[in-house]
């Protein structure tokens, strides 16, 4: 039993500078995978006033027009006017791309285990590292409630902006939600909501506060979670006209907690965007979420965290760890046994299991990689439920 407590998570909109960088990196990755599914991509992006810098290591047979992809991505986000200090037409795009290091490539091309002649041992992990996956029964999508609500708020802001319902909104925005949990660890109410949204110069704070409460908060936060004690901070600085890459420089991979579980679960430190699936930072994090979600969906635990760890150039994970936080009747060793039996966690196994050589990544680069109900992502499927139950019944 725990004490009543508060927990807070945040999200950012697609127009946040770090998210602009993530989307550019993943748009380039998708364009390359469309033509060359076997490409090795590690694409980083930095954005600032009037400038996008694309750099990293890419080995591919494909040609893609990086300038064109960058400009279109920036425009799609909503940076279409020079007065924003950053727009798709006039922004300078610098490209500095190298090939993947041959020292890394040799470990990925032929894993340590390849001598055993199993073709799934052909691909070694692209780096060492540890990755976490998590699921909890607080929401239908099996995500922690604070991050789920935070994502809903900024997605709603983008929707109202793009549909011109609130035409004064600009692309950059952030949200933060504090949830109160009872002594059983169950969410009871929303304690605090913070929303900061970029806006046109002429719009008053009073207008913004009214619109955000009526058309954003009341539309996406369940009414039973709000009460007279809920606190609201809407544009608490009073003004947010200068924003996006003009207000702050942005960089790929700087919003890894927004991308995952909002701090509710641990994180191994590796970012996702701009990386192809031989990079276990990305693919093994997706696999760990897939495992965790299926365990909770099967009713085997109410809350579970899965850790995977890899060595560079080695196909098999060096460790698998599962923590059910006392919410399962099963020993964690039994769950690990069932996971090993039903999930191939070698990089090639994950790539095949989740079909990760497809251009599916740009859509994940804003509003979270997990718990998405608006798009169809393979690691969000619960198609291993029966197999897990069957393994544990043996």
Swiss-Prot record:
Comment on bound cofactor: Binds 2 divalent ions per subunit. Binds 1 potassium ion per subunit.
GO molecular function: ATP binding; magnesium ion binding; methionine adenosyltransferase activity
Function: Catalyzes the formation of S-adenosylmethionine (AdoMet) from methionine and ATP. The overall synthetic reaction is composed of two sequential steps, AdoMet formation and the subsequent tripolyphosphate hydrolysis which occurs prior to release of AdoMet from the enzyme.
Name listed for the protein in its UniProt record: S-adenosylmethionine synthase
Enzyme class: transferase
Binding site for L-methionine: 57, 100, 248, 279
Subunit composition and interactions: Homotetramer; dimer of dimers.
UniProt subcellular location: Cytoplasm
Highest taxon of source: Bacteria
Lineage of the organism: Bacteria, Bacillati, Bacillota, Bacilli, Lactobacillales
E.C. designation(s): 2.5.1.6
GO biological process, one term: S-adenosylmethionine biosynthetic process
Keywords for the protein's UniProt record, in alphabetical order: ATP-binding, Cytoplasm, Magnesium, Metal-binding, Nucleotide-binding, One-carbon metabolism, Potassium, Transferase
Gene3D superfamilies assigned: 3.30.300.10
Record bears the keyword Nucleotide-binding: yes
